[in-house]
Amino acid sequence: MFRSFLHYILRWLAKKILKKYKPDVIGITGSVGKTSGKEAIATVLESKFSVRKSSKNYNNEIGVPLTIIGVEKTAGKSVFGWIKIFGKALSLIFMRDKNYPEMLVLEMGADKPGDVQYLVEIAQCKVGVLTFISHAHTEFFKTIKKIAQEKRIIISHLLQDGCAVINFDNEMVMECAPTTKAEVMTYGFKEGAGLRATDVNFIKNDVGWPVGINFKVLYKGNVVPVYVQGVVSRSAIYASLAGLAVGLFFGVNLVEGSQALSKLRGLPGRMRLINGIKGTLIIDDTYNSSPEAAKSAIDTTAQIEINVGSKRFVVMGGMLELGSETENLHRELGFKIAELEIDYLITVGEAAKHIAHAAKEAGMDEHRIAIFPKAEVAGTFLQDKIKTGDLILVKGSQSMRMEIVVKEIMAEPL
């Protein structure tokens, strides 16, 4: 009862604030890449406008209104805390805050059917960004088709003077283009994308480890170089492209956007590079996991050059909320790992056992596969196993606590 009442009040307050201040709202959703996309979009827009973005992963029926109000921390179960938040919202409504942002970049999650519809009814988006549609939360949506239907609402609800920014490389995303009367801008790696990334390279330090990526962006005959520090993933490139596309719609040119992105840093737990003990390098991708994101992370790990004699480790925790597809989707990862130049596979948790079993079936040496029930044990095992020059990817769903593995083998606390 209290939660329903809270949702109602927050929704009412948020809509009143938006009606008064009329900021341009940029909404972003997708199975993967929401948070990194949000960060890139905000970084580009901040070069010309006052911008507020969703704090942390505030992407639901509580988090989105709190971002609109300008609160970075929920009150939890504190009635007094919520009264203070309501008071701040009412002061915004009945008084005028000269510093209210010109733009809001709102991450919109979809854990269950109806979530995106609820959020866009609170905040009508000027720009809708759809990053990717893949298997995630299938436990609640049952099929990927139903996931797609929910995610596409962020595009179909746009008004004619708005803009849909969509991933050209994802077929299910592109199917939403005909559902909107708004301008459509596409981005990706494939030929035909409006903003296209090419010539991707890892930037290396003096000892040969990657410290970031650079690439070129092609747009209407123009070519602009982009450099992003501290990450090595395709997801960072997709996020940068989305940021540039949104920037273009609001008048931030490619050069200005590229310069802004050079200030972007990798987010904790999202393909971030961390120095490990014994002169190793960790790819920390522990924030969360989904089948598509895991495949991309494994591909990236296999592509990074290491010295002769050094090893690549993949440490995988289980992926949650996959319903009846749990076993099959984990097994796909195991088959993929066995095909690539991955030297050791370490799994954590019950679901991840399917990864290990599939890798063994596909021909990976069983002596190079280790199965552990908890992250702490896997971390201790790794401490003894890794050597100078080794590369370690650590990934898993949030509840698997895979960040514990990273803490066990990182060179210095962050």
What are these regions (language model features)?
Residues K34-A40, E61-G63, D111-V116, I237, ...:
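Short glycine/serine/threonine-rich phosphate/pyrophosphate-binding segments
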Residues R11, K15-Y21, E46-Q149, I237:
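ATP-dependent carboxylate-amine ligase catalytic core
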